Amino acid sequence: MRQMKRTAYIILLVCVLALWMDSVQAGSSFLSPSQRPQGKDKKPPRVGRRDSDGILDLFMRPPLQDEDIRHITFNTPFEIGITMTEELFQQYGEVMQKIMQDLLMDTPAKE
């Protein structure tokens, strides 16, 4: 009886480990780039400004009014949309304008 109980526990343990190993998906791939599966859609990284104040700043500031928010859209061969407050626009507007000019200007051909 005791041997049967031990065998049942071992079988249960093996099944649980097999299911666990099947569901684990981590580690690095040892496949060459040509052997890796193609077509996996990766999510683009989330880019945003990180304040030193962190999350507490979100709760301390008053709610934004519609007139405080400015949305800017650039249409070229691609579309860029940026939404920011008037305060952030005043602070970073010139830098954004410079970045957009650098992106949209024709680059000279390399010889």
From Swiss-Prot:
Sequence ranges of Basic and acidic residues compositional bias: 38-53
Lipid-bearing positions (O-octanoyl serine): S29
Tissue expr: Highest levels in stomach and anterior intestine. Lower levels in posterior intestine, kidney and brain. Low levels in heart, head kidney and middle intestine.
Alphabetic keyword roster: Amidation, Cleavage on pair of basic residues, Hormone, Lipoprotein, Secreted, Signal
Cellular location(s): Secreted
Broad class of the protein's primary localization: secreted
Propeptide: 51-111
GO cellular component: extracellular space
GO terms, biological process: G protein-coupled receptor signaling pathway; gastric acid secretion; negative regulation of inflammatory response; positive regulation of growth hormone secretion; regulation of response to food
Residues where Valine amide is found: V47
Residues with lipid group (O-decanoyl serine): S29
Claim: Secreted is one of the keywords in the record: yes
PTM field: O-octanoylated by GOAT/MBOAT4. O-octanoylation or O-decanoylation is essential for activity. The O-decanoylated form ghrelin-21-C10 differs in the length of the carbon backbone of the carboxylic acid forming an ester bond with Ser-29. 44% of eel ghrelin is O-decanoylated.
Gene Ontology MF terms: G protein-coupled receptor binding; ghrelin receptor binding; growth hormone-releasing hormone activity
Lipidation, O-hexanoyl serine type: S29
Biased amino acid composition, Polar residues: 28-37
Signal peptide: 1-26
InterPro entries: Motilin_assoc, Preproghrelin
Ranges where the record places region Disordered: 28-53
Superkingdom, natural source: Eukaryota
Keyword Secreted: yes
Biological role stated in the UniProt entry: Ligand for growth hormone secretagogue receptor type 1 (GHSR). Induces the release of growth hormone from the pituitary. Has an appetite-stimulating effect, induces adiposity and stimulates gastric acid secretion. Involved in growth regulation.
Family membership: Belongs to the motilin family.
Protein name: Ghrelin
